[in-house]
Regions:
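Bacterial N-terminal signal peptides that target proteins for export
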Residues: 1-12
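Conserved C-terminal helix/tail region of periplasmic/extracytoplasmic solute-binding proteins
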Residues: 326-392
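Secondary-structure end/capping motifs
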Residues: 254-335
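Hydrophobic core
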Residues: 13, 17-21
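Short, solvent-exposed loop/beta-turn-alpha elements that line the ligand-binding surface or hinge
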Residues: 84, 154, 232-237, 304-315
């Protein structure tokens, strides 16, 4: 079994490297174009705020995962939003953000809220300063030959050895009527969702859990399909997925920079909602996926699955998720007040999220639009933006 796993990981690493090279080239290209930021009504709205120049020229170290929930990080950089807000930000995209935050190596990070709770309990100087994504929008992706949930029992899956400790897996397994406990599967851990995807593509596993673009990527390349969804996105069941967190030492030492970062975060999300095609282009370059995958991903985040991207803090949703997590023994007791700080949102001059959606998004991209309807509207609004991957 160990030899088989080693061979499997060697194959996956080789395949992932191929995509990684493309992603790396994309990031480099993004850096080369950094001096030619797109001028938009979003950056203009920031200039119209007449923000005072910050005396503190500290460069923020900001981290995010290769998950679509955290797109605001690369949008802030490549759409010129950080620059317009008068802050310098070094953006790093990898799966080690929680560890880096715990070690004090990052000032801010887009992190799953459960990691905030766990970090707080072990003494990590960390707080939730703004929301980023509601609960849900997390998928179980399987190979095309899987037609029933029970076929997954006993299979090799990218769900880790103890999936029962994951809230989204519990929801999806129960919806499919299959066992939650990891002992019923051959669960493997991976270093990234991209690696999980490559394992499915090369036939090494039968399924995995991930966020987009690695669900849409599987369907785009016909490698697999989205089989189940954690749908705690809105309404009475709304949960919490990931947030923009701050290292409290950084926030204490550089309060004005921290507040300006929160403003930039909100403006990046506004950009995604109102400039979806341009946002998708930035997304696809930074994440190393085809443009078509980036566009479909942005559609899901902003219309298809609801208004999932948000900076609005929802204490009730966070409490609901914590109650579920603590009841299952994911971590010890912690309260909302201990890990959430509303002061940064209040003091950073962000727009009211609900008002923004009502006035700037609903009239153009109402919920309920099909992908084709939404894309047609987006093309009309952004006629000069590319919507197809360039042929080489």
């Amino acid at each position: 079994m160990q030899k088989r796993l080693k061979r499997m990981m060697a194959l996956i690493c080789s395949a992932t490297l191929a995509i990684g090279v493309l992603a790396g080239c994309s990031e480099k290209k993004g850096e080369e174009n950094s001096g030619e930021k797109a001028k938009s009504d979003i950056t203009q709205s920031i200039k119209d705020m007449n923000l005072p120049k910050l005396e503190d020229d500290y460069t923020v170290n900001l981290g995010y995962y290769n998950c679509d929930h955290m797109t605001a990080a690369c949008i802030g950089k490549d759409a010129g939003i950080f620059e317009a807000c008068g802050i310098k930000v070094n953006v790093t995209g990898n799966g080690k953000v929680p560890q880096a935050m715990s070690a004090g190596q990052m000032d801010a990070g887009y992190i799953g809220f459960q990691n905030i709770a766990k970090g707080f309990l072990v003494g990590t100087p960390i707080t939730i300063a703004a929301n980023n994504h509601t609960g849900g929008s997390y998928y179980l992706v399987v190979s095309n030959d899987i037609t029933e949930g029970k076929q997954l029992v006993g299979q090799t899956l990218g769900i880790g050895p103890e999936p029962e400790k994951g809230s989204s897996w519990r929801i999806m397994a129960e919806s499919l009527g299959i066992p939650v406990e990891g002992k019923n599967y051959k669960g493997i851990s991976f270093d990234s969702d991209q690696s999980k995807y490559m394992a499915l593509k090369t036939g090494q596993i039968k399924g995995y859990t991930a966020c987009d673009p690695w669900g849409s990527m599987a369907e785009y390349e016909k490698t697999g399909k989205i089989f189940a969804l954690d749908n705690r996105i809105k309404g009475e069941d709304e949960g919490e997925c990931c947030v923009l967190s701050l290292n409290t030492n950084f926030a204490k030492d550089h309060p004005d920079v921290a507040k300006r970062l929160i403003l930039a975060h909100s403006k990046a999300i506004e950009f995604i909602y109102t400039h979806p095609l341009e946002a998708a282009n930035i997304f696809s370059k930074n994440y190393g996926v085809p443009l078509e995958v980036g566009i479909r991903t942005v559609y899901k985040k902003t219309v298809g699955e609801g208004r999932t991207l948000t900076w609005k803090l929802n204490d009730e949703a966070i409490q609901r998720m914590m109650d579920e997590n603590i009841a299952h023994g994911d971590y010890g007791k912690v309260t909302v007040d201990q890990i959430v700080n509303h002061e940064y949102i209040k003091d950073s001059k962000v727009d009211d999220f609900d008002k923004f959606i009502s006035e700037k998004v609903n009239p153009i991209f109402p919920e309920g639009l099909t992908y084709e309807e939404w894309l047609a509207k987006a093309k009309t609004r952004e006629p000069g933006i590319n919507t197809e991957t360039e042929k080489k």
